[in-house]
From Swiss-Prot:
Cofactor note: Expected to bind 2 Fe(2+) ions per subunit.
Gene Ontology biological-process annotations: monounsaturated fatty acid biosynthetic process
Membrane-spanning residues: 72-92, 97-117, 217-236, 241-262
Major localization class: endoplasmic reticulum
Gene: Scd2
Full protein name: Stearoyl-CoA desaturase 2
Keyword Metal-binding: yes
Enzyme class, spelled out: oxidoreductase
Motif (Histidine box-2): 156-160
Tissue/organ expression: Detected in brain and skin. Highly expressed in brain, and detected at low levels in heart, stomach, lung and testis. Detected both in dermis and epidermis.
Catalysed reactions, as listed in the record: octadecanoyl-CoA + 2 Fe(II)-[cytochrome b5] + O2 + 2 H(+) = (9Z)-octadecenoyl-CoA + 2 Fe(III)-[cytochrome b5] + 2 H2O; hexadecanoyl-CoA + 2 Fe(II)-[cytochrome b5] + O2 + 2 H(+) = (9Z)-hexadecenoyl-CoA + 2 Fe(III)-[cytochrome b5] + 2 H2O
Membrane topology: Multi-pass membrane protein
Length: 358
């Protein structure tokens, strides 16, 4: 990319809301204040969102957990998907180049629908997006088929607020497999339903595009996640139908799913904790490579309101680069960013001494 374009994007990057310290109230959040330009804020600079900050007052009820209730439909469908994806791997050498490029592009766009869309925009409100970008992200999110934005954001806010408890939908204390995919194969813990149902989701209920997606999600996901990626290679450049189905659809979808799941599993079990050694989330560079920038997870749980979800800008963080490009085009704005001073203070106060990001 030409240097002058990178300089323009970098300049757009600097036009952010600077958070000089975390908001009050929580294990992750001290009692300091914010700075936006020359103004000081005594509360979160995201007035529309409060329910993604850790709640240290919540504790699991004593006693044995309820018996797992398997959802056999999900188990069978996930097994079939991954069998199809494994077969797709064997077909990759026989695929046309256009099919491989198309599948990769579909993977990246789908991933952005989760990372830049469901996660950083709608779950945490770390930046704002104009209608064309929101429309792109809602389509990309539908391509990813990981539940609609409303449900994804509700589960993710519960994950942050009640992290590592039974009210956390993918509680990593229940093991790698459960936090990776097992939580999707069983009925939700009663605490997840109870606490998740009480979260304030009024910001998303008021967003017509999010609720439109939720209303028409099933036909939308069938078209965008399965029909379109299968038919385009087959119809447009003569790929075999089996290659299109197993590589462009099954393999691509399985890779996107597992890249996202690794944030919940591997990034809570393996890696450094330079920002907060008291929480399980970690900096995992391999996860960040697969999940287009979401692997700096210790930072993200320490500072969930930072739009970059990382201390280091574009370092193995394509999602931040994408958002900054959108800002250059005027489609993204009001990006929240934690100041260097606040980050260093947090490292000194609660870090594990590794002083490494990823």
């Amino acid at each position: 990319m030409p240097a002058h374009i990178l300089q323009e994007i970098s300049g757009a990057y600097s036009a952010t809301t600077t958070i000089t310290a975390p908001p009050s109230g929580g294990q992750q959040n001290g009692g300091e204040k914010f700075e936006k330009s020359s103004h000081h804020w005594g509360a979160d600079v995201r007035p529309e969102l409060k329910d993604d900050l850790y709640d240290p007052t919540y504790q699991d009820d004593e006693g044995p957990p309820p018996k797992l209730e398997y959802v056999w439909r999900n188990i069978i469908l996930m097994a079939l998907l991954h069998l199809g994806a494994l077969y797709g791997i064997t077909l990759v050498p026989s695929c046309k180049l256009y099919t491989c490029l198309f599948a990769y592009l579909y993977y990246v766009i789908s991933a952005l629908g989760i990372t830049a869309g469901a996660h950083r925009l709608w779950s945490h409100r770390t930046y704002k997006a104009r209608l064309p970008l929101r429309l792109f992200l809602i389509i990309a999110n539908t391509m990813a088929f990981q539940n609609d934005v409303y449900e994804w954001a509700r589960d993710h806010r519960a994950h942050h607020k009640f992290s590592e408890t039974h009210a956390d939908p993918h509680n990593s204390r229940r093991g790698f497999f459960f936090s990776h995919v097992g939580w999707l194969l069983v009925r939700k813990h009663p605490a997840v339903k109870e606490k998740g149902g009480k979260l304030d989701m009024s910001d998303l209920k008021a967003e017509k595009l999010v609720m439109f997606q939720r209303r028409y999600y099933k036909p939308g996901l069938l078209l965008m996640c399965f029909v379109l990626p299968t038919l385009v290679p087959w119809y447009c450049w003569g790929e075999t139908f089996v290659n299109s189905l197993c590589v462009s659809t099954f393999l691509r979808y399985a890779v996107v799913l597992n890249a996202t799941w690794l944030v919940n599993s591997a990034a809570h079990l393996y890696g450094y904790r330079p920002y907060d050694k008291n929480i399980s989330s970690r900096e995992n560079i391999l996860v960040s490579m697969g999940a287009v920038g979401e692997g700096f997870h210790n930072y993200h749980h320490a500072f969930p309101y930072d739009y970059s979800a990382s201390e280091y800008r574009w370092h193995i963080n394509f999602t931040t680069f994408f958002i900054d490009c959108m800002a250059l085009l005027g489609l993204a704005y009001d990006r929240k960013r934690v100041s260097r001073a606040a980050v260093l203070a947090r490292i000194k106060r609660t870090g594990d001494g590794s002083c490494k990001s990823g």
